[in-house]
Amino acid sequence: MAQMSKYNQSIILKWAYVTLLLSLQVLLTSCAVARERPLQEPHTSAVQGLLDLTALPKGEITKLDGEWAFYWNHLYTPGELMTARPRAYVSVPSAWNAYTLGEEKLASYGSATYELQVLVPNDGRVWALDVPVVFTAYRIWVNQVEAASSGTVGQSAQSAVPAKYPQVVYLPGTGQTSLHIVIQVSNYENYRGGLWQSIQLGDATSITVSQQFRIIGEAFLIGVMGIMAFYHFGIYILRRKEPAPLYFGGYCLLIALRSAMVGDVLIMRIYPGLSWEALIRSEYFCVIGSLWFFNSFLYRLYPQDGSRRFKSLLTWVCSAFGLFIMAGSIQLVTEALLFLQLFILFTALYMCAVFIRAVSRRREGALAAVAGAMVLGAAIMNDVLYLRGLVHTGNFTTLGLFVFIFAQSYLLSSGFAKAFSSSEELAGKLIHLNASLEEKVRQRTRALEQVNKANVIHRRFIGRNVILA
């Protein structure tokens, strides 16, 4: 049995390494493909500010990717664009600080106008745009009519007000044969500006259903992680000698809060007045806090496989990052994101080493932990590349965390279940011992009674012999 268990662990470890290598290969391949060609096929990509979607089937949603007309450091309205000439055509989605106009490398901070002409089928469809987060403020016109905005667009940091609010924009009227889309964008806060995520176009029903499915999925994941957090807080309250549930509960809670600040930014639907700066600081702080909580949880699980020095180092680094996030200027905070991402990757590698060591030493529940860690590691690597603009896959950390949290919950539950089973076994042995002890006492009592009776008979016999003598 021991040999079979060792063989199974060896097989799972090999598959773990293979899965990790395959994940790396897929991510690197995606990165290379993203650099070599646009996300969409040529016939559905914009060329020099024109996108032909006249053959778009009903019910289908498409991305408005390709070459948009681009006016750097100019905020033009649709009327002003009639006489303006585009300085360049740029690839969307991409942060504008990745663009080079002539010999000028564009800065992170500034303003610009994007323009795209879209040819659509004249079949009576009501159109809608699915606009993701744009850093950090925008205004949208469609066919000369202002359709939506987020924050306040300005040509200086003093006049601009940032916001983080993705939304669905329903376009008025039916029967259009073309959509003239103009988007003003300004950014004076984030290290990346512009349209660095894809805007999607489709009929209103399809766009609405797509958004609702995303919101339901995100809300479900946030709810599950929140429930897991308070469940483990409850376990800690009942048994305070073991802090592992407290650490894991804190980790789940911070991840749930961060998940509400990314994607469709569900927290803005609850607190619409939350400022962009507070949102970004809170998001980064949740990342740092969750990293510390999970490392503390991991050290409690496998103290013999982890490093106490690394735990102390991580505490100091997380504290320094946390203070910097709360007190530093927002521009410096966002520009330091790369260092934060590198630190997260370094910590993730350390945690993987701890998990692998725990598996090789056949620690309890380490296999499930490694499986969850691999999924999370692949998701984090994808998101780091996505945030750097190297791939266009989307955010997967929340989903990876969902799988990972369930693996860790299984690990904790397994530990408590085994502790409970051991307690029951000990209780059963104690009951059996008490029962056997009582039986031994009864047997001893009967033996003593028999001895006493024998002694009484013996004394009587001796006394009778003495009298006769």
Set out the residue ranges of the language-model regions.
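Solvent-exposed beta-strand/loop surfaces of large extracellular or lumenal domains
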Residues: 85-103, 145-167
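Bacterial N-terminal signal peptides
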Residues: 18-27
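Interfacial "cap-and-anchor" motif at the non-cytosolic start of specific transmembrane alpha-helices
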Residues: 256-430
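An acidic-aromatic loop/edge-strand motif
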Residues: 161-223
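Extended carbohydrate-recognition surfaces in non-catalytic/accessory domains of CAZymes
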Residues: 31-124
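Regulatory cytosolic signal-relay segments
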Residues: 429-469
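First transmembrane helix
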Residues: 210-239, 338-358
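Aromatic-lined ligand-binding clefts that engage carbohydrates, nucleic acids, or primary amines
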Residues: 118-143, 181-183
